[in-house]
């Protein structure tokens, strides 16, 4: 049983609508320090939308968010959704909760090194020399230090995603969010990105991962949520859950019958 002091990231009763369509119907998640939580489910189940609600890239319509015991202050926006009440708090929140996107989202006009030092300098106020030294260490750690001075267009998809992970690590986040980080990659490049993610998990990084990689979910994560039509249909230990699914929809999903 988690106590409040154990929990690093908490999302409670998150609802989200697009027009009249409710896409998230009360999803909750509690991640302790060092947890690797995977979100699985078919396309359109709400996985990525929920992940984006955690740092307000999507504004939920109901729910509460807390990071390290600090609640994100929310107020009602004109469209009825919830927005951050305090812009500086949201900026700090997003640095504490770094995101790695499906399509890398590197800045095309910046070199690899410039991509990685941008947030430490301009968001965290780090001295440039310190940011560069840290960036070089991170690029070496993800195996792309030799690409520091090239532009994203000159990189393979796997290299771009590893740079994106280094960029996320550069702000020293408390939690890392991964939105299907391998789905845009050619199959032969998936392994190099999953290896970096496995290494991060081994270091005790807290990670929330939307993924279709069932092997990663089973072997690396310690908690798994199966989403279907905006609800958590089943959650628990991934090894147990993926080997002996309890609900029929998860059984169908794992057998390929639920698209």
Give a label for each model feature.
Residues 226-229, 239-259:
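C-terminal boundary and immediately downstream tail of ABC-type ATPase nucleotide-binding domains
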Residues 6-238:
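ABC family nucleotide-binding domain
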């Amino acid at each position: 049983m988690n106590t409040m002091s154990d929990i690093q990231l908490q999302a409670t009763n998150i609802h989200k609508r697009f027009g009249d369509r409710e896409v998230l119907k009360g999803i909750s998640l509690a991640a302790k320090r060092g947890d690797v939580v995977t979100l699985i489910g078919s396309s359109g189940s709400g996985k990525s939308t929920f992940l984006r609600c955690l740092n307000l890239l999507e504004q939920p319509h109901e729910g509460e968010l807390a990071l390290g015991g600090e609640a994100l202050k929310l107020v009602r926006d004109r469209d009825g959704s919830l927005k951050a009440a305090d812009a500086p708090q949201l900026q700090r929140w997003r640095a504490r909760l770094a995101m790695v996107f499906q399509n890398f989202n590197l800045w095309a006009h910046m070199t690899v090194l410039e991509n990685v030092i941008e947030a430490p300098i301009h968001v965290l106020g780090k001295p440039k020399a310190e940011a560069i030294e840290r960036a070089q260490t991170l690029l070496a750690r993800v195996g792309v230090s030799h690409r520091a001075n090239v532009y994203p267009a000159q990189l393979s998809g796997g290299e771009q995603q590893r740079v994106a992970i280094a960029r996320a690590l550069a702000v020293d986040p408390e939690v890392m969010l991964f939105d299907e980080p391998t789905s845009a990659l050619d199959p032969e490049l998936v392994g190099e990105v999953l290896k970096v993610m496995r290494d991060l998990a081994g270091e005790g990084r807290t990670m929330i991962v939307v993924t279709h990689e069932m092997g990663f979910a089973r072997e690396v994560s310690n908690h798994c949520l199966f989403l279907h039509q905006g609800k958590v249909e089943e959650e628990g230990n991934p090894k147990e859950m993926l080997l002996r699914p309890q609900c029929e929809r998860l059984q169908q999903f794992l057998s390929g019958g639920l698209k």
